[in-house]
A protein has these predicted regions:
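Active-site anion-handling motifs in enzyme catalytic cores
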Residues: 1-186
Length: 186
């Protein structure tokens, strides 16, 4: 699970991850919950929660435990790839484009939750499975997300996407090792 901090709707992604004890892949330090020391006890910063995850405000202690047990930060792709294999991750979802791409690169089905125009445009162009943040607000359980995870359009368009990429590299005289041959997926 990935989530982009900020706003009530986006923080519902974090809530669903917490509900199902999903691994939380943190992709930038701004996503990492801030803590404060209160009389010798480390606690989550209420300021961080209100700004970044307001729908979790009444679950502060749950979030603190979830963060300790389930959050992961990767500094290199090899470690991230090993994590997917070691933890036997079966499904990824969230608002972070690159987090879902890394899951997909590792053979893990992923569902993008589009919360901005950039993510929507990228998922449209690549024909990736997605739901809008508004659609996500109606989701009650993880199984409902799986219903949206359809790769039919990506499979249909994969060759053309690859050809477009290789043509770009060739046209711009960028060295590559790609040699495309068309194989019908039908």
């Amino acid at each position: 699970m990935t989530f982009t901090p900020g706003g009530f709707e986006r923080s519902k992604v974090l809530l669903l991850g917490m509900k199902y004890n999903c691994s939380w892949v943190i992709q930038e330090m701004g996503e990492y919950p801030r803590t404060v020391d209160v009389f010798g006890h480390e606690m989550l910063s209420m300021k961080w929660i209100l700004k970044n995850a307001p729908s979790v405000v009444l679950k502060e202690h749950e979030l603190q435990e979830y963060n300790k047990k389930m959050s992961h930060v990767f500094w290199d792709l090899n470690t991230w790839n090993e994590f997917y294999k070691r933890e036997n991750i079966k499904f990824a979802f969230g608002t972070r484009f690159h987090g879902n791409m890394e899951a997909l690169r590792n053979g893990v089905p992923a569902l993008w939750i589009t919360h901005d125009s950039c993510t929507a445009e990228l998922t449209d162009f690549l024909h990736l499975p997605k739901i809008t943040i508004k659609e996500f607000s109606t989701i009650k359980c993880l199984d409902e997300l799986l219903e949206y995870c359809d790769y039919t359009e990506l499979r249909k368009n994969y060759y053309d996407l690859c050809k477009n990429y290789v043509d770009y590299l060739t046209e711009n005289k960028l060295a590559h090792k790609y040699n495309l041959t068309y194989e019908s997926g039908e």
